[in-house]
From Swiss-Prot:
SUPFAM superfamilies to which the protein is assigned, alphabetical: MFS general substrate transporter
Assigned protein family: Belongs to the major facilitator superfamily.
Main location (coarse class): membrane
Membrane topology: Multi-pass membrane protein
Name the UniProt record assigns to this protein: SPX domain-containing membrane protein OsI_08463
Amino acid sequence: MVNFGKRLMADQLEEWKEYYINYKMMKKKVKQYVQQTQNGGRNREQVLKEFSRMLDDQIEKIVLFLLQQQGHLASRIEKLGEERALLMEQADASQISELREAYREVGIDLMKLLRFVDMNATGIRKILKKFDKRFGYKFTDYYVSTRANHPCSQLQQIFKQVGIVAVVGALSRNLAFLQDHQGNFPSIYDHPSITLKDPIIEQINHSVQKLTHATNLLQFIGQHALIIPEDMHSGSEDLVDDQSYHFMSLLLNLANTFLYMVNTYIIVPTADDYSVSLGAAATVCGVIIGSMAVAQVFSSVYFSAWSNKSYFRPLVFSSIMLFLGNLLYALAYDVNSLTVLIVGRLLCGLGSARAVNRRYISDCVPLKTRLQASAGFVSASALGMACGPALAGLLQTNFKIYGFTFDQNTLPGWIMCLAWITYLFWLWISFKEPDHIVRENSVNTPSSDSGHRRNSNLEDGLAQPFLIDAKESLDENGEDNDENEEDPEDSHKPATSLAAAYRLLTPSVKVQLLIYFMLKFAMEILLSESSVVTTFYFNWSTSTVAMFLAVLGLTVLPVNVIVGSYVTNLFQDRQILVASEIMVLIGIAMSFRFTSHYSVPQYVSSALITFVFAEVLEGVNLSLLSRVMSSRLSRGTYNGGLLSTEAGTLARVAADMTITAAGYLGQNSLLNVTLLPSFVICVASIVATFCTYNSLY
C-alpha cells in the first residue's frame, strides 16, 4: 500500500510542485510538537498557535495559486472567444474543429486544477487527523470553528468553487455554440435543462459535483432521507448509468414508501375505538400502533441484507405480508380477537421495505438524479403521513357484506388490502431487477473494473468532505505506513454486523442518533395518543382527529422547502439544530396540563410547535448525520440508513409502550406521564449537542 506522502510526490505536477501542501514538513512538525510537549519544552497553547499559523500559510499558498490558475484559464477562454467570433464569419469547418479542440484543452487543464485541489484537500484532512491522533487534542474542532466560517475564510474560497464553476459554464456555452457553427444551438443559460454531451465537460461536471458541498433544497431534502451515495464518501464509481436506469422501478419503490406510510397512520384516529370495541382499554392503542414498529426493528435488518441480492423479491414479500396483515386487522372485529388485531399489525411491520426503498435509490439511480429521487422518497413519506389520517376521516360508515363488518375501525384494513394487492399486480408486471444485481447473481466472480478506475483517477477522493468529517476514513490508502497509524475504521470495507457498525460511531454520530431517537419519540407520543387525549379533554370525533393529524402531516413539505431553500443559507446546520431542539423542548413543555382546565388552543399550538420543529430538526439532524458518519456506513447491510431507521423505530416502540403503560394510571394522568420522558430525553439531547457542538460540521 502506497502511503499518502509518496502518492502526493508521485502524482503532483512538476511545474506546480512548490504550490502543493508541504505534507512531509508538516508531518515532521507534528512529531516535534509531540516530543516537545512531552519534554515540557512547549505548552499546548503555543503549539496550537504555531501549527495554526503554519497551516494558514499552506492554505493561503494553495488558494492564491488556485485563483491565479483560474485567471489564466479565463484569459485563454477570452482569447478563444475572440477567435470564435472571427471564425463564425468565415464558417470554416476545419478551423472550427480546431477551435473546439482548443476549448477541450482548456477543459483538460481545468481537470488538472481540480486534481490539484483534491490532492491538497486530502493532505489537509490527513494532517489534521494526524495532529488529533498524535497530539491527543481535538485540533480539528478548534481549527474549523475559527477558520471555516470566517467572512474571509480561505477554506470557503477553495470549496465554494465559484471560479471553477464559472469556467465550466464558459466552456460549456462555447462548445455548445460550436456544435452548430450557424449559431442555432440554444444557449445553456436560456435552456438549463439542455445538457452538452461532451466527454470533457461531463467529467468536469462530475468532479465538481463531488467536490462541491453547497446547500440547496434538493440536497437538504435528499439528506433528510439519509440516502448516502457511496461515491459521496469514497469516490467509487456509480453502479448504474442512464441506459440501465429504470424509472418505473424507482416509481414502484416510491409507491411502496407512500403506501407503507399510509398504512402506518391510517389507523391512528381509530385505534383507541377499535381496542375498546374488542373489550380492551383505549390506551391499548399504544400496543396496536406500536406492534408494527416492533416488527419493523427486525424487518429492517433482513430487508437490508436481502437487498444485496435482489430488490424485486423483497418488494413482493413486503406486499404479501402487508396484504395479510391488513386482512387480519380487518377481520379482528368479526372474530372479536385483540390477538388477531395485533398479529395483523405485526405482519404489517414485517413487511416494512423502507430499507429496500432507500437502498434502491442509493444503488440503482444515477448520481445526477439521486438527489431528486431522495427528495421524492421524503415527499412520498410526508404525503403518506398526511393521507393516512385524512383517509381514515372519510371512512365514517357502517355496513355488512356476507357477514363481514365494514366500519370506521375495519375499513382501513380493507382499503389497504385492496391497495396492496393492486400494488403487487403492478409490481409483478412492471418492475425490472437492476442490471448489476442480475450480473452478480449470474456470475460468481466479480468483473474487473480496473481500467475504468484508472480512467477515473482524477475523481478518486474528490467526494470526501473537506473538513466536516475529520473522524471519517480519509483516504483509500490509509495513514502513512511508516507510522503504523491506520485504524480499522480507515478501511473501506462495510460493517458486517450491528456491533461492528456501532464501533464505527463517533461521539458526534451517537449524539445525532440520540437526537433522532428523541424527535421520533416526541412525535410518536404526540400522534399516537392524540385520539385518546382529544377525546378525553375535548370530546373530538374521529373525523376531527383525522383532520388534525392530516394538517400536521401536510406541514412536512412546506417546512422542508423553507428550511432547505432559505434557512440553511442563513445559518449553519448546527445552529439550526440547537434552535430546533430548544423549540421542541418548548413545545413539549407547553403541552403539559398545569391546571384543571386544558384548552384546545393550548393543545393545538403546542402540538404544532412540537411537530413542526421536530420536522425541521429531523432534516438538519440527518443532514449532519450523513456528513459526520463513517464512509464504511454508506454501504453494505449495516449502513447509516439502517442505523437511523433502527433508532427511529426503537423510539416509536418505546413511545407506544409508554402510552400503554401510562394508561394503567388512568386517562386523567396519561398526558403528563407520557410527556415527561419526552421532556427528559429532549433536555439530555440538548446537553449532548453542546458537548459535541464543535465537531458538528
